[in-house]
Amino acid sequence: MMRHEYFVILVVMTAAWMQAAMPTDAETNLVTTSFWRFEGRLSAEFESAYLSSSGTLCDTRPTALQNLDWAVHFGDYGKLYGYGCFLSMMHDKQHELHRPAFNEFEGGAFYGYDWRLTDDVTFFNGAGGVWNPLFGYRNGYDDTLWEFRYFQSLENPYLTPYWDTLTLIEPGQWTRLRFGVRRDFALTDALTLSAWVDGVWGDKRRYKARYGEEPEYQFLYGAFCTSTAGLQLTWRFAERWLAYAKARQFDTLDRRGRRAEKRKTDYWARRDIAIFTLGVAYEF
């Protein structure tokens, strides 16, 4: 059994135990009367290509992901939240870089706070760290990635603007920023359509990490620019179960970056690509 399968089994057992141990509404009168509240979500999905959180297109072949998202709310004191994700490439086309059964784990922990401006508008802030151990690599690069992330969004029923920054701390250093807007549309009680568009900008160190060369010119000291537009249809087919389908269009915006991708011989060196995702999730 692979490591990610053990992880999924452990997560499911832990979630079941916590759900059973959690007091019910009848036992507490109201859940909101307790100081803290726990919630989580388990999901499994298949993607036609893999786009990393750094804004980099890492693979253009099918990928499987298993995710655990969790949050502990402390009333007016904010929340602790995070995630754990196992990623597996469903092929061995990059075996010269990774072991044939390629499995990668990424996890993060954050603190977030909602500042309620009106009944409908909330200003969210979140910050924390990401841990990405690169175990099992064949090329001798078994180091661990440490990243810092910071989030802000203006949550509202109309059009939510958001931005976040991701900074690689170790090994090496680079920074990327993402700015975007999103909106959810309730089609029925069970169906929700989500739409978003965002752009990613990276400094010259991020540019060099992707393309292996210095940028020819520097806009705000960098030239790594990409964009993603997406649609997701979510179906709540049971009280705690969701199924979803997602389509995204990824584009490289920087002209020199597009030329650098074109010169590459790697099969995953694509300047633009449509990415499709199918998934199922359980909330607890």
Predicted regions and their residues:
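Residue-level detector of the transmembrane beta-barrel scaffold of outer-membrane proteins
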Residues: 39-43, 79-83, 122-126, 158-162, ...
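Outer-membrane beta-barrel pore domains and translocons
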Residues: 43-51, 85-89, 112-114, 128-134, ...
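Predominantly the C-terminal beta-signal and adjacent terminal strand-loop region
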Residues: 195, 227-284
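Short glycine/proline- and aromatic-enriched beta-strand/turn motifs that initiate or cap beta-hairpins
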Residues: 21-94, 281-283
